[in-house]
Amino acid sequence: MADNNTPGDKKLSVPTKTLTLKPRVETGTVRQSFPHGRSKQVVVEKRGTKRRVGDGAPDAPHAPEPVVAKAPPPPPPSNRPSGPRPGSSQRGGSGVVLRTLTEDERSARASALADARVRDMEERRQAEEEARRRAEREAAERAEREAAEARRKAEEERHRQEEEAKRKAELEAKKRFGEGEAPRPATAAPQQQPAAVTAPARPAQAPGRPQGAPGSRPQQIGTSARPGGAQPAGARPAAARPAGAGPLGRAPGVAAGPEDDEGPRQIRRGPGGAARPAPPPKTTHKPGPQKQRGRLTVVTALTADDVRERSIASFRRRTQRLKGHAANEQKEKLVREVTIPEAITIQELANRMSERAVDVIRLLMRQGAMHKITDVIDADTAQLIAEELGHSVKRVAASDVEEGLFDVVDDSTDTEPRSPVVTVMGHVDHGKTSLLDALRHANVVSGEAGGITQHIGAYQVTAPDSGKKITFIDTPGHAAFTAMRARGAKVTDIVVLVVAADDGVMPQTIEAINHAKAAKVPMIVAINKIDKPDARPDRVRTELLQHEVQVESLGGEVVDVEVSAKNKTNLDRLLEMIALQADILDLKTNSDRPAEGTVIEAKLDRGRGPVATVLVQRGTLRVGDIIVAGAEMGRVRALISDQGETLQEAGPSVPVEVLGFNGPPEAGDRLAVVENEARARQVTSYRAHQKRENAAASISGMRGSLEQMMSQLKTAGRKEFPLVIKADVQGSLEAILGSLEKLGTDEVAARILHAGVGGISESDVTLAEGFNAAIIGFSVRANKEAAALAKRNGIEIRYYNIIYDLVDDVKKAMSGLLAPTLRETMLGNAQILEVFNISKVGKVAGCRVTDGTVERGANVRLIRDNVVVHEGKLSTLKRFKDEVKEVQAGQECGMAFESYGDMRVGDVIECYRVETIQRSL
């Protein structure tokens, strides 16, 4: 900026400002922006303040402010009478002053400061909260460590005490049984050892009685009497035996035999000689009993350690004697309780009775029945045989393996409240899935092909007011999924009937009402789409009266709620009504028991294998449980919730995806947890056997009708459209098969060669090739090998995601097999006036067209006396010797027929055209 002095002005002037020391100032220019797009370049000064001794505290530093270039600065106020102000600055002739803040800037600054203070307080509060949580966490961890250390010390102390007690017990046992410490080496001469160490002192021996006389007291073992009284040098000292040991180291408490009381066997030297103990017998350790080798003498027989055993010949003689006695004795008959199933072989029955199969066959022969041991007899015959042989009978059925799987009565004291299961039903496109999306804050409709629900889905929603969880089951609404809706009604507690306010009651709405009545569950009517201009909720209530559904507003007991899934209107009231209805039902179950549930949907996933959507109804399903559903079994490998989270367990009313089945079960099968794999195999084998028997019975029952059908096919020429169908889930496959079955007529029908769940494989392509069939994949794809094989063999594979498109295409293809319809269109009539015989042409009829027109090449009938005598084509049509295409009424012409010449005067010729009309189903 320029200073205030005008160029060329030479006048001297005294500055009006107070003289101050010029501080060190740093200046710069910036462009200041104002509202409404205005801007201004200003000078910015940066001052440094000094603090002097004796001055008061300097003012709080201010942020640098914009400077006005032209306006002179006002004199700064000073409290001191004289002297320069420490913080003042002097701008020598520049005339630059600081601009005061505007009201908006001041308010903005104040609000910024207030926001900063609020943020500071919030950060300080969060820091304090975090410090408190950290302190609590550290205290909990410290307490846990102390508890773990205390447990460890207690465990170590317990182990130490157990080891000490064990060691003491071992020492005591060693002391008692003479297996304690090793003998100490002798430190003194054996002859200086006292005579009796372990025995009490006895009176002196009577004089004149020789040592070793019959009446003398036997000596101790430790001091054997030798002629001189000396002990051998290598003898074991008496003190080597443990204290408390009896003679020869016998354990205390063991009674000594007569030989022990008299001491060791002694050898007499003579009448007055001293007796010495006999040498100990030699002990030989042999690996086992052996036969006595060499010559058997008295000495060897007495000194042999081996115990004589019975010879083989003697053992055989004894066995023969026992057999002879046993043959003479009358055996006591054993009466057994024989378990008899519905069918059993003769050999198995004899084994269970511990009887010979020959006796059973002999008994049957006396009754006039000839059988072999491999023949199967029924339970009644087996019971008669067992009772005839004196046994008791216990009848069992094959279905007994299912006893105790389901419907076990729980104790009322163990039950607890559970979440309600709500099924949403209604007509197609009435907003069932959209209503669930609004409740779940999700978007499932966009994920469904064509925006329609083709799978049954289960979700959990938490009520905002009460916090209780509600399980919703979404069912398809169109006509093909009747079986799915029936399954949904069976497992539900409450049915929410969704009716569109602009559409009213439709066929699937009526079907849903019937399902709810058959399941005997309460119903809540949700009148949806009330946000539309043509919505008429009162008309819906009136139409429901025709089907015996009377809402509360019309004096009935059925709750009705007007909702809008699009605008999320009255959704809280709908949840409130559901919770109220659940409280009225008082839903309780026992969660501490093996789980029971129902398979809502099942599919075969390529990456995860068989996957079943299961609604747990009772108990708790855990990872690792052995489960049975229908004819399939498995062990739970994983539980996945509707949100995609992996769970370790699922309680009552919780829908989960279960991984671990051997194969995909059928939708609607009941699931149960069994105790072991053996029980699971019994149940599944029985159910598979029942399934095969039912299939065989249905085939055998259809034999007569099948023969009749084959004869009808030969006579009527009924055509078949072969198909191989693979779908993603069992429910969709059922819907497709039901829809295709309805397309069949007396002339054409769909023949399903194979229908299954999973991707299209090479075996499917091979089967389709053998019958020249088409392959249909619904929400599945063919693998690489199957696609290559189909392309190589010319087999068509059609993929669909919407069931309507699949049914329409099959309907068109089957319509192509229908024979077309022939429709006659009358053109005109002519009467023969004269018949001419022309050479090289044949007979030609001269006719007059009475009505309509006659065209060349059209079909004709020759009618004589109201009887058709010929049908053919008109080969020649002339008028005055000219070939013409047609002749109008009232004109005369000449006609000739193809390959026919028997025409007479007065015959009538009908001319008509045949149109071919393609038929459709």
Swiss-Prot record:
Ranges for region G2: 451-455
GO cellular component: cytosol
Signal peptide span: none
Residue ranges of the region described as Disordered: 1-296
Stretches with biased composition (Basic and acidic residues): 116-182
Keyword tags: Cytoplasm, GTP-binding, Initiation factor, Nucleotide-binding, Protein biosynthesis
Region annotated G5, chain positions: 564-566
Descriptive protein name: Translation initiation factor IF-2
Taxonomy of the source species: Bacteria, Pseudomonadati, Pseudomonadota, Alphaproteobacteria, Hyphomicrobiales
